[in-house]
Amino acid sequence: MKERNESLDCLKGIAILLVMFGHVQVHNHMTDPYLYDVIKSIQMPMFFLISGYLAGTGKKITNLEQYRKKIGRRAVAYLLPFFSWLVVQHMTYVPQALRTVLFQLDYGLWFLMALFLFTVLCYTAQLLEAVTEKEIAFWAVWLTGCCVILVSYLAGVTFLSPSILIIYLPYYTVAYFVGRHREFVETYAPASMQRWIAGLCAVVFLVMVVMLDLVTVTGIGMLGVQTA
């Protein structure tokens, strides 16, 4: 039996608590100029970092049959609750709600759909890598998918909300690379250096929380507007 990573379990627990506390604030109309900025800026990026890292460290797709089975399991795990909650929440007008959520994912449990789309792209890239036996094939497929999402966002496409996907795709991508190449990262960035980098990033983040309205920052473009 594979040993669980207790550090990742702790991070997931922290992220879950942040999501709960953030939603308590929103639904009870509790306004705070800094606290919600901090929560919103940490909770979902943390989830996608963890998801990407686990995908990078986990067992890879090796054949088409395995690809089909894993996609099926992920569809049940992610899409079933996504659409079930939509039906429960909008029971009297499901068709209208369905049309809305497919073009505005944050109308529903958007995280599940976003994670499913990233997972499908990841498994597809892994399948091509297994066929060619070259890692470059994985990154070719992955970066092509990233470009499709970026172009869709820039073109104003709203189906499956590229505007949301483009925010969290970098977190998933970087974490996947780190998870897949842990030895490489540890060689060129030892633990002491990682702690210094993490501390510096934390300081920069806290300064951004104080100086900027991170709730409205939906990408590098908006960050540039606020700092101009």
Predicted feature descriptions by range:
Residues 187-228:
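Alpha-helical transmembrane segments and terminal signal-anchor/GPI-anchor hydrophobic tails
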Residues 26-28, 59-62, 182-185, 211-214:
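Transmembrane helix-loop junctions in multi-pass membrane proteins
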Residues 118, 122, 143-153, 170, ...:
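Hydrophobic, membrane-inserted alpha-helices
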Residues 44-58, 111-126, 157-188, 224-228:
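Specific transmembrane alpha-helix
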Residues 30-35, 97-105, 151-163, 212-219:
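Membrane-interface helix caps and helix-loop-helix hairpins in membrane proteins
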Residues 1-147:
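Membrane-cytosol interface segments of multi-pass membrane proteins
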Residues 64-72, 181-190:
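Hydrophobic, small-residue-rich membrane helices and short re-entrant helix-turn-helix hairpins
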Residues 1-7, 183-195:
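Short, Lys/Arg-enriched, disordered terminal segments
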